[in-house]
Amino acid sequence: MSKRLLSLASLALLFGCAQQPNDRAQQYQQQTFPHILNRADVVESNKPRDYTEFSKQSELVVQGSASMAKIYRPLYEQLNEWVLQSGDPATLAQFGIQAAQLGGGDKQGNVLFTGYFSPVIELRHQPDSVFKYPVYGLPKCNKNCPTRAEIYQGALDGQGLELGYAENLIDPFIMEVQGSGFVHFGDDDTLEYFAYAGKNNKAYVSIGKVLIERGLVEREKMSLKAIKDWVLANDEATVRELLEENPSFVFFKPSAAAPVKGSAGIPLLPMASVAGDRSILPMGTPILAEVPLLNADGTWSGAHQLRLLIVLDTGGAVKQNHLDLYHGMGPRAGLEAGHYKHFGRVWKLGLENSPTQAPWALPPEKQQ
């Protein structure tokens, strides 16, 4: 994912029907959905609603991108009017708003929600006995960049690429997965934003998946917290061996502290923006989503909440029936985001007689 701070990601889909599990908020329909996007003449949802952040997020899009404003401003305006006058999804058509339901990986409408956040990690400008793990800027290696293991072994030493030094390996690793992040330099009390600068073009391997396959963390308990707990319980050599299972490495470029932005270049608001697959959800697309609500321990609360969200980011692991919900900045946001691997129903929205009309339409090669 483009402009995020330190991040994480990469999860798979679960399927179900009638008596199948619903512990991750799955819902089962009386019908199956044949396509990725399926025309919905009426949206039926009785979930509690919270549309409070949509107006602010849509305003940031209009202010920040003339091209997206040209396409989406009329739809945003109609959605804001709909929120003021009704907010009932069954009345969308009365405002000229069209909907297409995502079919879900199981063709039952269950769309996977994971979470991401903007971490703030502690760095120092110079290494010492504690802060000794470098965060790197982009090297001039083109397609012959070293692997993670080679970088850990010193392949980039002496090139002046060190942007700062962390107190462990896992914090920079998580920032790499997120794609960007905020850093706090404790030696001069400054806050900087480390934006994504590039990567070494090696294949990404999920360390969460490795931990599950090795039987070190149960699949049902996998989360960012579970990964960090495992890291804290093991020595540096063991942790390093695990991280080296992922040869991919992300490089950063520092900038003054700024609003967190996604790949669309628009500031992101927590619980109002998502990363999605731009082949079916172009940047700026508004969606109506039944977002699963979780308990503090990461289990599903038994409820969903209906929200208006805008797709403003992308990610290598975010494909088709998978959305990555932005949770905000800092440790609490990270804890909440790390719990998310649950399901909800999602509708892509469009406005009749506008560039966004017929949101169910896909190029023939993408129809499934």
Curated annotation (Swiss-Prot):
Gene Ontology process terms (BP): cell wall organization; peptidoglycan catabolic process; peptidoglycan turnover
GO cellular component entries: cell outer membrane
InterPro entries, alphabetized: 3D_dom (IPR010611), MltA (IPR026044), MltA_B (IPR005300), RlpA-like_sf (IPR036908)
Lipidation (S-diacylglycerol cysteine): C17
Signal in keyword set: yes
Pfam families for this protein: 3D, MltA
GO molecular function, one term: hydrolase activity, hydrolyzing O-glycosyl compounds
Protein topology in the membrane: Lipid-anchor
Cysteines engaged in disulfide bonds, as pairs: none
Catalytic activity: Exolytic cleavage of the (1->4)-beta-glycosidic linkage between N-acetylmuramic acid (MurNAc) and N-acetylglucosamine (GlcNAc) residues in peptidoglycan, from either the reducing or the non-reducing ends of the peptidoglycan chains, with concomitant formation of a 1,6-anhydrobond in the MurNAc residue
Alphabetical list of SUPFAM superfamilies matching this protein: Barwin-like endoglucanases (SSF50685)
Lipid group attachment sites (N-palmitoyl cysteine): C17
Position of the signal peptide: 1-16
Keywords, sorted A to Z: Cell outer membrane, Cell wall biogenesis/degradation, Lipoprotein, Lyase, Membrane, Palmitate, Signal
Subcellular location(s) of the protein: Cell outer membrane
EC identifiers of the protein: 4.2.2.n1
Gene3D superfamilies xrefs: Barwin-like endoglucanases (2.40.240.50), RlpA-like domain (2.40.40.10)
Function as written in the Swiss-Prot or TrEMBL entry: Murein-degrading enzyme. May play a role in recycling of muropeptides during cell elongation and/or cell division. Degrades murein glycan strands and insoluble, high-molecular weight murein sacculi.
Protein name according to UniProt: Membrane-bound lytic murein transglycosylase A
